[in-house]
Amino acid sequence: MQVGEEMASLTKIACPIVMTSLLIFSRSIISMWFLSHLGKVELAGGALAMGFGNITGVSVLKGLSVGMDPICGQAFGAKRWTVLSHTFQKMFCLLIVVSVPIAVTWLNIEPIFLRLGQDPDITKVAKTYMLFFVPELLAQAMLHPLRTFLRTQGLTSPLTISAIVSILLHPLFNYVFVVRMRLGVKGVAIAMAFNTMNIDVGLLVYTCFSDSLIKPWEGLALRSLFRGWWPLLSLAAPSAISVCLEYWWYEIMLFLCGLLGNPKASVAAMGILIQTTGILYVVPFAISSAIATRVGHALGGGQPTRAQCTTVIGLILAVAYGLAAAVFVTALRSVWGKMFTDEPEILGLISAALPILGLCEIGNSPQTAACGVLTGTARPKDGARVNLCAFYIVGLPVAVTTTFGFKVGFRGLWFGLLSAQMTCLVMMLYTLIRTDWSHQVKRAEELTSAAADKSHSEDETVHAEVQDDDDVSSNDLEIGLLQNTN
């Protein structure tokens, strides 16, 4: 396979994901802007609530849905179409069930935060935000499996279009709820949930009326929802752990900020910096998603060399981006914070930490791409082990020791993250170097076979016409659904 062709295939999948992710992450920036104009306490409380919502809700749902990636990607490559629909159905049900205890946790955050030593004023604002943010769980439970279901078929533009419409409405919703209706922090939370719901509506409309994809409800039967869970759960659980371990690190950083000399300024600055890392993360995330899809297709189609080529090219792209991101944030360290606040103390903390954040991206970008390879090869347990070691055995002790032991303060937390990212990168590269790609092809066959529900008396056969098997996109994929009886 030509290197140029594979790079074009990766960028065709990744570019719409970059645009979509920027749009989705920009909603947090818009929300932070409205919070900053409500006051310093509101900004700090809102940032704390967003972080808590991400690590206890969004990260869990997103992590579980990552378990779909290897099954759907490899099933698509192996042309086992029914497996895609059944996997979506099971994942949606799983996320709905998991959302219940998450919602209960959100509704009881005040005693949790106070026992952890957080400022009472900040905690009160965070409690209010989380109360009105609960509908986001239902919206996320639909969004994550549906976007994965579409992406593994090479369909990324529907999400981009839905995100564009949704983000255009987001400032309007914030203005109506926060300014006109004077709901304050409540309005910011409601507007955020509305944003995700709007994306869901767009994707569902596309799914219902488009003839260019496998339908997620194909083969839906009550008994199919009670069978064949193990392949999905065995991937979803470690995937969730891997994602959550990384997400939780940022929440720990927020909590540690609350123990510094000026908790309000430190928490607010950390919230803005975490949003900044979110913006920078969209390109590595897109590369990772593209790698996972292409590697899954290659392994499902019995092409180990193509999977290895995809891995190498993806890592090269990720390294180049990491270097560019480091230069970008370092150059803008004196002006970046002014986009969010005019508080001198907060601006000083942001400016001091941005160069360290830039160094973190040099490690974060390629290690995120490497995570995509592990996802595409159905090895989430390896990713979980790496994140546990890098972030909690190495990074957390470095952060605590540097911040409080050596009295470095706010920047010490970011030195901890830097050590974690570099450790993670080294361990990921070591894991990939030892990969036996021929063995991964055999594992892909075993996985898709196990995920197929062979107990049904009926199965659906889907005939796909693809102009170029190595270049699947929403423009060249035509799928007709035919029902055959065994």
Swiss-Prot record:
Q: Where is the signal peptide?
A: none
What is the native source organism of this protein? Arabidopsis thaliana (Mouse-ear cress)
Q: What is this protein called?
A: Protein DETOXIFICATION 53
Enumerate the residue ranges of region (Disordered). 448-474
List locations, semicolon-separated. Membrane
Recorded GO terms, molecular function? antiporter activity; xenobiotic transmembrane transporter activity
In which broad location class does this protein mainly occur, judging by the first location in its UniProt entry? membrane
One Pfam match: MatE
List residues traversing the bilayer: 15-35, 45-65, 94-114, 130-150, 159-179, 187-207, 240-260, 267-287, 312-332, 346-366, 386-406, 413-433
Family membership, please give it.
Belongs to the multi antimicrobial extrusion (MATE) (TC 2.A.66.1) family.
Keyword Transmembrane set for record: yes
The highest taxon in the source lineage is Eukaryota
Its keywords, alphabetically, are: Membrane, Transmembrane, Transmembrane helix, Transport
Q: How the protein sits in the membrane?
A: Multi-pass membrane protein
Q: What GO cellular component entries does it have? A: membrane
Is-annotated flag, keyword Membrane? yes
Locations of Basic and acidic residues compositional bias?
453-466
InterPro entries reported for this sequence: MATE_euk, MATE_fam
An example GO BP is: xenobiotic detoxification by transmembrane export across the plasma membrane
